[in-house]
Each structure stands twice: as C-alpha cells, then as structure tokens.
Amino acid sequence: MGRFHRHDDRTEHTHDGQEHSHSHSHSHEDLGDHASYETGPERISVLERIFSENDAAADANRAAFAENGVHCLNLMSSPGAGKTTLLERTLAHLQEIGVRAGIVEGDIETSIDADRLAGYGAQVVLLNTGDGFGGECHLDAPMVRKAVGGLDLGSLDLLIVENVGNLVCPAEFDVGAHTSAMVYAITEGEEKPLKYPVMFRACDVVLVNKLDLLPHLDFDLELFRGNLAQVNPVAVVFEVSARTGDGLQAWHEHLTTMVSV
C-alpha cells in the first residue's frame, strides 16, 4: 500500500516505501516525515478518473473560451485574503476602460460576494458548492463549464473565476483558465509559501494584499518574497492594498495586457 501523489506536471503515482520509477524526474529527498495514508488500487483508480475527467472538461472550457476570444483568469486565496474587495476595484476599472468582464463566483454558501460584484457592469454567475458534507472546498472544470452556460461568452473579453476560499484545494483542479493568480494577505505570515507550496507554485501572479496594515504587523516582506521565490521564482508579484487602492494600477495594467494578447 502507498500514498497517492500528484505532481505539478500532472503525473500521478503512489509511494510504497520502496524504490519506484515513473516518467517524470523529481527528488524525494525533501519529503521529510510527512504523514501518509493507506490507499489501494480502487482508491487510486477513482482519483485518477476524477483528475482525468476534470482535465478533459478543462480542455473543453479552454476551447470554448478560445472560440469566443475570452481570456480566463482563475483567482484563488485563503478565506478573507481580500479577493472580493480586489475584484470590486478591478471590475470598476475594467468598466471604465470598456473591458467586458464576466464572473463565476464560487462560495460554499450564500450570494454575499456575488451580490457585491453585481453592481460593476459584469455578468455574474453564482456557484454554491454547499451540497454534500460541508461543501466542496474548490471549483472544478465541470462546475465552471456548467456556470459558463449562464453567461453570454460571445459578449465577453475576460472571465474571472473567483474560486472558493482555500489555500490548497483550488490549485489542484484545472478549471480551464489561461492565467492563475492568488491574493495573499500579509496577515497570513511569511512562511506560507513553504508550508503550503501547491497554490504558490501553480500561480502566474501573486497579489500581496493588505499592505496598508504593514506598519501595524511584524511582517517581513522581503522574507516572504524570498520564500515565494524558493517555490516559484517566476511568479509576477504585485504589492497592493485592495482597501486603499495603493498598487492596483500596475495590476490593472498587467491584467489589461493579458486580455489584449
């Protein structure tokens, strides 16, 4: 029995405590004494099928976006990092410059965030994941595909998927986005890129938010940047305050460039 493991290159295998080989190269020297869980062939088969079906749906989403000339951004973060506040300011800017935006708003329960975003001229579709035990902690490609059915893709330039607030799971599931970004609040500390590397590694853009709180916190911005560089040296980093608007101009220019490509 072993531990199921999925890598950034989307290959999968189990660790059984013995030597193993597979089609991609990476080092396990840094695995340390991680807790493992027992799996059997049935569990592995189910996980492989889930990822395979999701990846097929993600490819279909990307094809639909390409057909309609839509750039898709997957926006992720922990709960409370400031995604929705950032989106409010971003949508207001996009409305001013004539970029036609749509939002897929993911939350376990309520329409609170979707209601907040509805006043900025964007098409907004709500995805509540609360059915089942506690609700899904992420959006996946089939969910997004279903939500996109409620949008007029042909009238959009940009689709933003605001994923469910969670620092791990959303990064595991390809939703068909062209760009992945995350909002990271300085209240979360400097060490999270090292402790929870999956999302940081998966993102093209990291928006370091709540910079207006920096004078009141013992947050070392350079240490955070160094930790981030260890897991993702090529991520584009913006230091912003969604509350005050500081730093957002550079982010807006970057986003506009992505949409126009």
Model features per residue range: what roles?
Residues 78-79, 104, 185-186, 206-219, ...:
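G-domain G4 guanine-recognition motif of GTPases
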Residues 179, 204-205:
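Well-ordered beta-strand positions
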Residues 37-63, 67-73, 81, 90-178, ...:
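Nucleotide-state-sensitive switch-loop elements of NTP-binding domains
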